[in-house]
């Protein structure tokens, strides 16, 4: 496993110890953010990766984008700001939800973006046309049954961790600056296609 994945796993594991859900969104910094109250680590998605995730999903004004584990709300804010689409961010951490809501207002996209405090594993995802994920592989696996209920043509975009045993339609790597770290992005289109072992 690449060193960057090991490091990310360590940070994600720290979050599991302090909360039920790791969340990772993205608005400016790429550095891990440590909550003062519970030491939970939130790893923001770099802006360049956010932009590429939305681009590869071919987000358009008519789309409805869900970000599961929205952190500071940067992905849904970027989607609404650039493409004029509706977007919903979900997070189980009430403080991150409040932060996201403040960022939504600050960016003037309240009419397009909602932020909700919910358990992502209990969501009905059928109304989403695009879903963005930056979660641990185990969490991605747990979400697959929900993702499979999305409508044909809907897209799922994963940052760094792929959906296990699901064939991706596209994989690309974005090298972020100034750290020079390569970050993988995986695109899936519904219906999801299982990997067939040869």
Where are these regions (language model features)?
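Conserved SAM-binding motif I beta-strand of class I
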Residues: 86-91
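A short SAM/SAH-binding and catalytic strip from SAM-dependent methyltransferases
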Residues: 126-142
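Class I SAM-dependent transferase core
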Residues: 28-61
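Conserved class I S-adenosyl-L-methionine
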Residues: 62-71
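S-adenosyl-L-methionine
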Residues: 93-127
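Bacterial N-terminal signal peptides
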Residues: 9-24
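C-terminal substrate-binding/active-site "lid" region of AdoMet-derived donor-dependent transferases
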Residues: 138-198
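Conserved SAM-binding loop of SAM-dependent methyltransferases across substrates and taxa
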Residues: 74-85
